Amino acid sequence: MGRILIAHLFLPSSVGFSFDTVPHDEVGSKFMQKEESKDWIADTPLDESAIVSEEESDDDSLLSDLPEEIDSTNAQSNIATPSPGTVAAAISGIQPPPKTPSSDSPSLENSLSNLNDLFKSRGRHMAFSKNDGTNLSLPPSRHQSPPPSSVLASQRHHRRHDSELEEFARRASRSLSFSMNGTPQRRMTFDAEAWKNVIFKIKPSSFGNASFYNAISAATRSKQFDDHLFVGTCGIPTDSLPDSLKERISHDYITEHSSLVVYPTDTDFVGHYNHYCKNILWPTFHYQIPDNPKSKAYEDHSWANYVKVNKAFADTIVDNYEQDDMIWINDYHLLLVPEMVRERLPRAKIGFFLHIPFPSSEVFRCLATRQEILKGMLGANILGFQIPEFAYHFLQTCSRLVNIDIRKNGVVSFENRQIDVIALPISIDPGFIDRCLASPPVEHWAKVLQDRFRGKHIILSHDKLDPIRGLRSKLISFERFLQKYPEYRENTILLQVAPESLQDSEHLPHISDIVTRINSAYSNIASRHVPVILLRQKLGYAQFLALMMISDALIDNSLREGISLTSHQFIYVQRKRHRPLILSEFVGSASILNDNAIIVNPWDYSKTAEAFRTALTMSEEECQKRNKAMCNLILRHDAASWAVTFQSLIKESWKEQIDMQRIPAFTAQLIKEPYQNAQKRLILLYFEGTISTWGSQYHNVMTSLQRTINLLNMLTSDPKNTVYVFSALSCQELEQLFQRVPKLGIVAENGCFVRSPPKGDATMPVSKKEIAELWKNKVLGTDLTWMKTVSEIFEYYAERTTGAYVENKDATVILHLREAEDDEAAMWAAKECCESVNNFNVPCSATIQNDMVVCRSNKVSKRLAAEDIYSANGGDYDFIFAASNDPDDDTVFSWMKNFKQSKKEVVPFTFSVCVSEHGNSTNADAESSGVFGFLQALEKVYSA
């Protein structure tokens, strides 16, 4: 059994360095307690809820120092004992007193602490977390800012801030002298010798998607998940590191932490992450189209960096790939990796999961690199999204922008491959949360917070300071709530946890103004009541769980978001108190929880204000009913089952793809012997593009048609054979075409009308009256009023596509595109027609067949017609053969395969052929690249 290579931009653990010149043992003793000094380079699993925002958790950690996995038998030893700090002080409204410097707290360490704080707001180039008291630092970054300073003039005001960083850096490192300025003109200098024997430490990282990593950890503990390696960056600048040190780091990662380190250049990483991901992809995927000059500069200059980082990941994956390995690529940072790996490993198992929303096609098409991104994603065998809406948007976008075939079951046909598109929402790990809730730190904080907020209604919220999170609309709605309902002004608090993010500098002033306005109007000095508490730091998980326990409601007012695991955790934590959840309708979780949550439109301030009151006045019976229903919904699949399920789906999708690729070329030898030995045969052949090359219905290639008629006469002359031809043409057209094949069965308009073969001597003439009596109307009594509506839709697109025309038959409507002057316009019209009809509330479906768009009733299909033919003729066939070039006939091939599981005494021999250059069928037994080759092989079968 192979491994799983799990690619994510950040590894679950990061690296910090010590520049002290003391021996290893002394450093170990200094860094850790004595009993831990022997193995201080140790990794611990990230907890599932360390980062509340599962979709962009690298900026949204709840933990400044991540707790280790809790052992249910000894929870206390694994969670740090709480101590008073900035969080408690902020909640109480009193700032903690400054610490007095001592010999145990040298100025260097204080400087590093300040440096850490400054670095945290600058993305990837951060000092290592210093929460355990270790003296750790980072190598200097050598990145150059991709957009030139002349374009991004707004960055000039940061230069004084940069000089402060430089001063801190000089004080913090004895061996380094470097500049943190992002401009190309200022380069860093350092002493390379200082890095040769530097001691480093690997421990859990504050970057990355903690909910994802916890799901993998939970699945691993369940013993249902395969061995795996993480592939990602280590979260630090690496250009300054000598190769020998990188080798040491990589060795420890692979041997101790099951991780493969990717080393992009600092310039590429900053351009990729800080610029393209954060300023282009993240806003666009959340419906905030970047249109300012700064964003345009990022897009123009950082796309190349984005490509290079994706290529670095692909190179690492390919270089370490072994036979039978599976590759699982995650999130919008690595959208190009699937295609890059597919080009070099055509038969690899590749899955891709997008943890953030996928926008509608009208938004996605605004990206200049839309084609490259879509094709990059389509390199996978399976694409996973959080909810069906996101999967639908992706399918719709592919249909409109890449011109590929989309099937109703969420399968994309692209470059002779079938890609499955599925929705699989991530979930929480209830076992881990239970162990945390039972731990002393959570109990302690719950008691502290209950005492602090006794007699108050607490409405909790946790968001980054990002415009997408809807903080502004939330605060305005809360202000209106207080204005309209004065009885809540003295006893209700909106407690907003807002950890820092890359967008702080731009968004914070707007939020601060609103908070100040509300608190100025409704605070009470005498009672020390403040209606809005804005916490600008990351909370420990114990603290946040305690906050959720004592809160009277939680609101997620995001303008766009995937699955809100914060909301799911709140629901689970509130199983005893049953307090309600206020949820934006634009959050993916809303489609899962439905009306059990209080669903709001974040743009409607008045309705959101009413939602606050509804949450605070809801009866206990109603709260309990809603909470129970929501718990049942979120616990259908936990975090472990999510990871295990997606792993299984990657394998299944890959197997289907391999089975399709293994389809042999159709030759007479494949069915010659079974054909000769059979006593009763059923032969089903599609007309257009299978037994006849097909132009328009008036321009058939006559030589091919004559050859087809000759072959059909040979087959129908054998009394052991029952032969049917399927077609999209009408009854009259098919009778005219095949009047020289009197013993032929015909299925017209793709299953709407069926004519059985006449009985008796094949040489006897058959009258028109007798032929007419043989036709069976399969749509008799079926509602066909939709035809007028569909015809109008088809006419709309035909008028805009030169050479296209619409044909209304007895039970189908066809848009003919074969003679369209512009092939690209014709393909666009076909896709749009199918989408317009299939998304319209009419009892019919439209499919693309041989340069036609055919719309028929949902009550009929070629598979149903095939089943009726089989039953009507006794059903005791010992040989069933079918051939088609229509992807829609894959259902017929699937029906034939079911005979192999039949419990009948005599199981018929079945064989299906896909006649197509692109191998459109996954259920066919063989394929033929064209009509002439297929006819030649079938002629050999008969004449053998």
Curated annotation (Swiss-Prot):
Sites of Phosphoserine modification: 141, 145, 149-150, 163, 177
Regions of compositional bias (Polar residues) in chain numbering: 73-84
Pfam families assigned to the protein according to its UniProt record, in alphabetical order: Glyco_transf_20 (PF00982), Trehalose_PPase (PF02358)
Region (Glycosyltransferase): 173-652
Protein keywords: Glycosyltransferase, Phosphoprotein, Transferase
Tagged with keyword Metal-binding: no
Bias kind Low complexity: ranges: 101-113
E.C. designation(s): 2.4.1.15
Gene Ontology cellular-component terms listed: alpha,alpha-trehalose-phosphate synthase complex (UDP-forming); cytosol
An example Gene Ontology molecular-function term: alpha,alpha-trehalose-phosphate synthase (UDP-forming) activity
GO BP term, example: trehalose biosynthetic process
Residues recorded with modification Phosphothreonine: 189
SUPFAM superfamilies given in the database record: HAD-like, UDP-Glycosyltransferase/glycogen phosphorylase
Region (Disordered): 73-113, 129-166
Domain of life: Eukaryota
Enzyme's top EC category: transferase
Signal peptide: none
Reaction catalysis annotation: D-glucose 6-phosphate + UDP-alpha-D-glucose = alpha,alpha-trehalose 6-phosphate + UDP + H(+)
Family statement: In the N-terminal section; belongs to the glycosyltransferase 20 family.
Name under which the protein is recorded: Putative alpha,alpha-trehalose-phosphate synthase [UDP-forming] 106 kDa subunit
Organism listed in the record: Schizosaccharomyces pombe (strain 972 / ATCC 24843) (Fission yeast)
